[in-house]
Amino acid sequence: MNWREIAVTVSSVGEEAVADLFYQLGCPGVSVEDPELLQSYVESGNWDYHDFGEIALTGTSVVKGYICEDHELQPKLRQLDEGLKELLQRFPEWVLQVKGLTVQEEDWATSWKAYFKPVRIGRHFLIKPSWEEVTPLPEDIILELDPGMAFGTGTHATTSLCLETLEETVKPDMRIFDLGTGSGILAIAAAKLGAQVEAIDLDSVAVKVAQENVELNQVADRISVRQGDLGTVLQGQADLVVANIIADVILMLIPDLKRIMKEDGEFLASGIIGHRSSDVEAGLGEHGLEVLEKKEDSGWVLLRARWQRASL
């Protein structure tokens, strides 16, 4: 099967909006290549410039989406074009360049490997690609991943914020719901901290990849991975609900927290671009939640919230 890879070069503040356009098209794979992250790897001596070409020098980000080259390709391309034009009208400095090329599915599934290297997050997490060898420290918690076509290697600020907060928050035998699990990295991290996790995703590719990563990390006894939305898949209530998605989707999820989160539970919301944080905070407040903690990294925000006592 052939896929059309659309690469949109965009200022970092526009990452979320462009990624959302791809999600609206039903793209099964969306990636963000962050030049600041790649530059940090160069400066630390982990990589050399030739590992990834020009992107580290651009000072922008590249958002890539993949659209199947079938009878729906042209309508989807027109829809994407209209969406990008609308963004350009509202924020002329955001979208800088758009490129497209045809890729084979097997190429799409493996081309990103050049960008994925072992990385330490928080106090103890060591994220290791399945094809890389590392020498761990005794206290390391190894998260071994093969993300394939699913989003989530742990290197993006949104995911690293979640991992750091999980390390501070998770207690043994907690029940956790991971909404939009992607590669399964957050579910696996929580399971290795002792939690029982129910991970869901609407994308069948993500569910397949997440299940493979769960088995790779030998935590299948602590994680269930299912396809579907929280209204049809999740039963009961969790001690902790995690959503590393985008602001608009988080806002749609908030009304359901009353059903799926315990009275003394907490909600971790990440994937929020900085200028949308106030919208999410307002949405939480409108539904009886208070923000306990706000973390920021590279223009992205994580919010940790719980029920206000008066709302129970």
Swiss-Prot record:
Recorded GO CC terms: cytoplasm
UniProt subcellular location: Cytoplasm
Record-listed S-adenosyl-L-methionine binding positions: 159, 180, 201, 244
Entry's EC annotation: 2.1.1.-
Source species, domain of life: Bacteria
InterPro entries associated with the record: Ribosomal_L11_MeTrfase_PrmA, Ribosomal_PrmA_MeTrfase, SAM-dependent_MTases_sf
Pfam family, one: PrmA
NCBIfam families: prmA
Name assigned to this protein: Ribosomal protein L11 methyltransferase
Organism name: Desulfitobacterium hafniense (strain DSM 10664 / DCB-2)
